[in-house]
Amino acid sequence: MQDMMGGFFGLELPEYGNFPYPESTCCAYVNSGRAAFECLLQNMPWPERIWIPRFICDTVLQAPQRLRIPVERYGINEQLQPELPPAGRNDLVLLVNYFGLSDLSEAAAQLRGRCIVDATTALYTPPLPGVPTFYSPRKFCGVPDGGVACAPFPLHQLPENTGSSSRHSLHLLQRLEEGAESALAASEAAEHQLDNRAGRMSRLTRQLLGSIDFSAAAERRLRNYHTLHQALGCINRLNLPASPGHAPMCYPLICGIPGLRDALIDAGIALPLYWPEVIGQSTACTTENKLARSLLPLPLDQRYSFSDMERLSRLILE
């Protein structure tokens, strides 16, 4: 529908047009990462089971549960690499690219096409050849909704949403005007709304994604990663690449310094726990439990400069 000419002004957004995954018949724009996962499952041969790692957010289980696909769980090692399960020829395996730093090419080759890649924390890593992959731009930039499903075959689109994303965009404006802490409750409410409705990506999110310079954001993320790794690589128990091939979501640090998480939070560094439900579902000796308790996802995104990374490194090392 053509918009009205004249009248009050709306948001005036630049148009960079370099979002990594343009919409196409094989790339569906939906309103969340879990909706993108569901979109892929609906467009693939129905599996007898799907294997999902234990080290993952519980929301990923919503899609197979809604589609009544039986779920089995499998483990990963201490370097965030999959320990492939005994999947049958009619099973699917969900591989997770953790923070954009996992190399899944060998695992995908072993599975011979019986896999989907969860790249919700790996926006800048393109799909492996022939492997369906889904993304969550909301973890990388300020948009109210959004998920992307990419496949080596045409995808049937989800239905249009009946509501407007403006109702769950409040947290973005609130953070801008009042700060992050004031917007936490609104952010959690917006997340809950996305749990209950799968549909297409909103017009607002499409416009906002077009207004972000993703190339510049990727360069900033890589520079910040290099700064952190140069300072912290010597204490990090994770064997991370010195120069990752694609821009990561964060710098995952495991170092065993007592009280470090609380000290950083007290210093104003937001450190989400990936993932708290894993701790309650596993014993203390499991790899997943240890990762959930000890992994510190240090922020390195496009909002921050070299001096910010130096300050963060000093807080940890001093």
What do the predicted segments below correspond to?
Residues 56, 75-81, 119-122, 137-141, ...:
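Short, acidic/turn-prone active-site loops that include or flank metal/cofactor-
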Residues 3-10, 17, 21-28, 33, ...:
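PLP-dependent aminotransferase class I/II
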Residues 3, 7-27, 35-110, 114, ...:
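PLP-dependent aminotransferase-like
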